[in-house]
Swiss-Prot record:
GO biological process terms on file: lung-associated mesenchyme development; system development
Originating species: Rattus norvegicus
Subunit structure: Interacts with DPPA2. Interacts with PCGF1.
Annotated region (Disordered), positions in chain: 1-77
A Gene Ontology cellular-component term: nucleus
Keyword terms of this UniProt record: Developmental protein, Nucleus, Phosphoprotein, Transcription, Transcription regulation
Record-level Gene Ontology MF annotations: chromatin binding
Phosphoprotein is among the record's keywords: yes
Predominant location: nucleus
Protein name: Developmental pluripotency-associated protein 4
Pfam annotation, one family: Dppa2_A
Annotated InterPro entries: Dppa2/4, Dppa2/4_C_dom, Dppa2/4_central_dom
Length: 297
């Protein structure tokens, strides 16, 4: 027979093992409570139950109140519908004991027929749509963003002034008088350059001239006047030519009935009465040929 102490020890061992297993496993009661909490939240969402929000506004920040339009006294002549505010039109209808219900156009027509029968011919000028009957506001600023403003402009009506009211200009302004009396003067050298500028435009142009254009002429005194040098030179040397003028330009006669444009600037001096003033010396003829070749090359 086994002693009683050993039996008690064996009985206590399985109890300790069961307690250890129970402590290692999670408690089902806590899991149940968590599951029930989730179900409650889902049921609140399904039912649309939300926490109460403060519907009342803060007393320090009052709500936006509608601006009250001042009602003017009843007029003797009814203005157009687009110049009357809706609230003003309703107040006038109530003053005349008329119905102010419906659209703005309907109330305007009722008031026009009841209180202003003399203006009934103007009924054809009343707009047909409610959009055209809206109140026309003057220029105002609409705030789009903080710090930025956008302006709404109303087109201005252009009024023509009768011709009788336009003042006539009797005396011209001082500025016009100064401009009209201004005279531009140029020196003699600038005038010569301007006159010969057209010749330079036809640098490569050759023109046919009569054969008798290249005739040498000797003065009775043995001197000839060169237009480029601006002085009289001995006429004994050969090669003097007479300048030909055609189409407002001076030409130097050349061989075979041709002519070359004159590029040398003439002197601003006049010859004596007994000398011809359209002759060119041989040196100037040679210089003009060289200048023409350089321009062509």
């Amino acid at each position: 027979m086994e002693p009683s102490g050993s039996k008690k020890g064996r009985a206590e061992e399985p109890r300790e093992e069961v307690e250890c297993q129970m402590s290692s496993q999670p408690s089902t009661s806590s899991a149940k409570t968590k599951a029930t909490g989730k179900k409650q939240r889902k049921s609140e969402k399904d039912d649309g139950c939300k926490p109460e929000e403060k519907s009342a506004q803060d007393p320090e920040t009052p709500g936006h109140a509608r601006r009250k339009v001042p009602v003017p006294p009843f007029p003797q002549h009814l203005p157009p519908v687009n110049l009357i505010h809706r609230d003003v039109l309703r107040a006038w209808c109530q003053e005349m004991k008329l119905s102010s219900k419906g659209q703005k156009l309907d109330a305007y027509k009722r008031l026009l027929a009841r209180a202003f029968p003399d203006q009934m011919p103007e009924l054809k000028n009343v707009p047909d749509s409610a959009k055209e009957a809206r109140l026309k506001m003057p220029r105002k600023k609409m705030k789009t963003e903080p710090g930025e403003e956008s302006q709404v402009t109303v087109p201005l009506e252009i009024v023509t002034v009768p011709e009788e009211q336009i003042p006539a200009l009797v005396d011209p302004p001082v500025l016009y008088e100064e401009v009209s009396t201004t005279v531009v003067t140029t020196s003699a050298s600038e005038a010569v350059l301007a006159s010969w500028a057209r010749i330079a435009a036809n640098a490569k142009k050759l023109e046919a001239v009569p054969s008798n254009a290249t005739s040498e002429t000797y003065g009775s005194t043995g001197e000839m006047w060169c237009v480029v040098h601006g002085t009289s030179l001995p006429a004994t040397s050969s090669g003097w030519v007479r300048l030909q003028f055609h189409a407002g330009q001076a030409w130097v006669p050349d061989k075979k009935g041709k002519a070359i444009a004159l590029f040398l600037l003439p002197a601003c001096t006049f010859p004596p009465p007994h000398l011809e003033d359209n002759m060119l010396c041989p040196k100037c003829v040679h210089k003009n040929k060289i200048l023409t070749k350089s321009l062509e090359g």
